[in-house]
Amino acid sequence: MNTFNKNYWDKKYKEHKTGWDIGDISSPLKSYIDQLTNKNLRILIPGAGNGYEVEYLFRLGFTNIFVVDIALQPLKNIQKRIPNFPKENLIHSNFFDHYEKYDLILEQTFFCALHPTLRSTYANKMVELLNKNGKLVGLLFDFELTENGPPFGGNIIKYIQIFYSNFEIKILEKCYNSIKPRKGRELFFIFEKK
């Protein structure tokens, strides 16, 4: 099955079959965002789903937040929850067709939803979308990669192989503040574009 299919994802959201949705911003991303001081950063959240990170950033006064999602329903959900959020910043498109530039890209369960054959393409696309010294920051699952996803897992060694040629790996380590159901199964990372 091609999991990167807008009908598949729209159906999941319409039927509320979103077991990955924790209903709030994840504590690791909240902690990272809380230490950001530049509210003018251009921030992209690809495959944001219901976009709790978007809502958190917006309420903190960040002004340049963008979401790209192949599924329309989660974008509608964000707009409904945050009516003042700029509608033009909710981009209904295939991530791989997106061509803007950003200072920061936040990763929260998008990478793990892509089939593993797309991982190198994902890494290359992230480099393309980031400004010089831009950062890709977020969470990756730390469990054995199988074909039984999404979610698709991986490990530190696999992730280094995917990202090291284009990124300086600042941090890639076991996440100390994961939510209980994901404890011991997540890696927090900060990758800076070379």
Sequence positions of predicted segments:
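A conserved beta-strand element that flanks and buttresses the S-adenosyl-L-methionine
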Residues: 106
